[in-house]
């Protein structure tokens, strides 16, 4: 894994962002998540990844989110796209409960790519027992990092996610709450073991996402950056 800082800040970009946003605007980012389901086009997709790699000189995470877990549109040839961008990627993200997850696990091992097994719940934050079941499934599948993102509707949801983070602080996890009420978790959880927090530049990819400049400033104030 090629992250210089942990916790790391991942900035989320689309294809048009790669073509238009200068390197200077990504100052403070440790990782770029390219959200293919948010791309305007998926033809010649490897060109976008190659450009991002050369232009920004940061590790790349390829994510092609399913609509049922927050994807903006359905991408039917997900496996083919993952295979096409292997030369440029350091990380893949795949839903733990997706049909392609076992194949992506083997593909990642073969190509020395860190695989993030993710779970997104846009309705609520499940119980601790249910979160543990998701975590156990991810571990059983051999995911390198397990990401859990849930909708925060009340204060106790923040507490549940923080407790889960503390419980697994020695594991490789990403834990965050979505929605306006989930914003504190994007700031607090990285202090206690969540490896990556996600930030936006223009369009947010999940409710409650914080702008990159604000997240970098927050990390500096909290002593997570020099």
From Swiss-Prot:
Keyword terms: Amino-acid biosynthesis, Aromatic amino acid biosynthesis, Lyase, Schiff base
Listed PROSITE patterns: DEHYDROQUINASE_I
Pfam families per the UniProt record, alphabetical: DHquinase_I (PF01487)
Catalytic activity as recorded in UniProt: 3-dehydroquinate = 3-dehydroshikimate + H2O
Residues at which 3-dehydroquinate binds: 33-35, 65, 186, 205, 209
Metabolic or biological pathway, per its Swiss-Prot or TrEMBL entry: Metabolic intermediate biosynthesis; chorismate biosynthesis; chorismate from D-erythrose 4-phosphate and phosphoenolpyruvate: step 3/7
InterPro entries hit by this protein: 3-dehydroquinate_DH_AS, Aldolase_TIM, DHquinase_I, Type-I_3-dehydroquinase
Any single GO BP term: aromatic amino acid family biosynthetic process
Uppermost EC category: lyase
Domain of life of the organism encoding this protein: Bacteria
An example molecular function term from Gene Ontology annotations: 3-dehydroquinate dehydratase activity
The family this protein is said to belong to: Belongs to the type-I 3-dehydroquinase family.
Full protein name: 3-dehydroquinate dehydratase
Species: Thermodesulfovibrio yellowstonii (strain ATCC 51303 / DSM 11347 / YP87)
Lineage: Bacteria, Pseudomonadati, Nitrospirota, Thermodesulfovibrionia, Thermodesulfovibrionales
Gene transcribed to yield this protein: aroD
């Amino acid at each position: 894994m090629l992250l210089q800082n942990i916790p790391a800040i991942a900035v989320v970009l689309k294809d048009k962002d790669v073509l238009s946003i200068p390197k200077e605007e990504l100052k403070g980012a440790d990782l770029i998540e390219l959200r293919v389901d948010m791309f305007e086009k998926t033809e010649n997709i490897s060109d976008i990844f190659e450009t991002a790699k050369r232009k920004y000189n940061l590790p790349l995470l390829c994510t092609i989110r399913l609509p049922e877990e927050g994807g903006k549109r359905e991408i039917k040839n997900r496996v083919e796209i993952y295979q096409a961008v292997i030369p440029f990627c350091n990380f893949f993200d795949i839903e733990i409960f997706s049909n392609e997850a076992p194949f992506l696990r083997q593909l990642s091992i073969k190509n020395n790519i860190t695989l993030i097994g993710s779970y997104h719940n846009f309705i609520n934050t499940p119980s601790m027992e249910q979160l543990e079941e998701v975590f156990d499934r991810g571990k059983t599948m051999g995911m390198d990092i397990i990401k859990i993102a849930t909708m925060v509707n009340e204060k106790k949801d923040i507490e549940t996610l923080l407790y889960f983070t503390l419980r697994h602080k020695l594991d490789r996890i990403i834990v965050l709450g979505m929605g306006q009420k989930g914003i504190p978790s994007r700031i607090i959880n990285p202090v206690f073991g969540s490896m990556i927090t996600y930030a936006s530049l223009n369009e947010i990819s999940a409710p409650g996402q914080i702008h990159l400049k604000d997240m970098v400033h927050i990390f500096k104030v909290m002593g997570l950056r020099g």
